[in-house]
């Protein structure tokens, strides 16, 4: 396909228009008084959301050059969402601010490579300062509630429920979000286990919207070797198929003819089935398979124990109320194992934790213990309508990710204040040349943008508030909800440090790429206007027939 080639200012301006189009749509959602965005769908009701990444993912622009800019900033939002689970709007706002300031300087003759080096140095210094500002969350359910409430758009009820869920399953437990049958939102704790292995083929997916394979009341086959041949599996498959129940296969690997046949049977609908790799490696894999066997009331089919796959019977299979599998994880809920056997296994792992001298082994044993004893907390989100349910579920997902990030890396003052406080370290950075120093100044100005946007969305004047916050010390900041100046930590306006850090790093990374772009290639659309007509000679005599 032919390419349209744009250079220099023409390329950068086109990309900037795309960046602005996407960022302006996303940033209206930032802060306690941020607004909703309504997204039209080709079928069904429109989606109403206040989640930055949901808005970003829907945006495709007509102009190919502008669309390139939009897609690059979309990458900032989705990468931040993948790593931190929240902070997507902050990341987008930061990226737009760095691009805006940077392009002004490039147009004025600054060297883009030096600017990028300055930007990278500034981000490194800010990240180090954020680490100094961080306070640990520990087991404080009050702090967990505050982080969750803010991330759920100041919804205290969601904050309470997430704090409750963390209280029940602990940091190591697994928390999932489901749609409730009624209008009530509540937390249920279900005994269960999650491990980090996803489905072996996307053809096993049963829910194409979420890309998950959900098996209700399945049999679970546990095998410690690779399965390549279908004939080994047939003795077990036949009675399972007759029972009409789904089957989950957990083995070292399933490949070749065996995997192909399972996929074909799943697609034909003759067998509800999914296969995942066994978690862990070596001896740890054997131990984890045994954990799953005890939890589900099954037996690990292992040649070491004298069992072989072709002689396996349906009695050796475990069962569970439900198994949910996505591309990365498998969650087994309400395994049918014997409570006494599970308790004995838990005590055995606790004894191993006490006797081990290796920190790594201790960590892995604690993970296994949490999976056996911690259980799964399910947050059921209820609402009066489907549209409200989806919007609320998005907020609960955000809040949950933010809370995990806070538990992992601690918290800093929220509302954009942590970045403003970190600004002072930028004046101490040693730079090689004036353009590098300009790169540092670009970041210094850009990190004011989250607070500025929060204030403007609340109807205030950004510059006035920023100056007032700069005059204050430590956690002094602006509460846009009440439009007053407060101590952010005492007022419970806090952000996970991980979210702020990841947003800043991703924004600077993509903005740096845009600033150092000198040439953009886009496809020239082919003109298909004459493509489908008749050959010329055929149409010539038609008018005379009238």
Swiss-Prot record:
Alphabetized InterPro entries for the sequence: Chaperonin_Cpn60_CS, Cpn60/GroEL, Cpn60/GroEL/TCP-1, GroEL-like_apical_dom_sf, GROEL-like_equatorial_sf, TCP-1-like_intermed_sf
Chief place where the protein resides: cytoplasm
CC annotations in GO: cytoplasm
Catalytic activity: ATP + H2O + a folded polypeptide = ADP + phosphate + an unfolded polypeptide
Residues reported in the UniProt entry to bind ATP: 29-32, 50, 86-90, 415, 495
An example Gene Ontology biological process: protein refolding
Region of interest: Disordered: 526-546
Record key words, sorted: ATP-binding, Chaperone, Cytoplasm, Isomerase, Nucleotide-binding
This enzyme's EC code(s): 5.6.1.7
Localisation per UniProt entry: Cytoplasm
GO molecular function, one term: unfolded protein binding
Stretches with biased composition (Gly residues): 529-546
Stated family: Belongs to the chaperonin (HSP60) family.
NCBIfam families: GroEL, PRK00013.1, PRK12849.1, PRK12850.1, PRK12851.1
Role this protein plays: Together with its co-chaperonin GroES, plays an essential role in assisting protein folding. The GroEL-GroES system forms a nano-cage that allows encapsulation of the non-native substrate proteins and provides a physical environment optimized to promote and accelerate protein folding.
Quaternary structure note: Forms a cylinder of 14 subunits composed of two heptameric rings stacked back-to-back. Interacts with the co-chaperonin GroES.
Protein name: Chaperonin GroEL
Species this protein is from: Christiangramia forsetii (strain DSM 17595 / CGMCC 1.15422 / KT0803)
Lineage: Bacteria, Pseudomonadati, Bacteroidota, Flavobacteriia, Flavobacteriales
Gene that encodes the chain: groEL
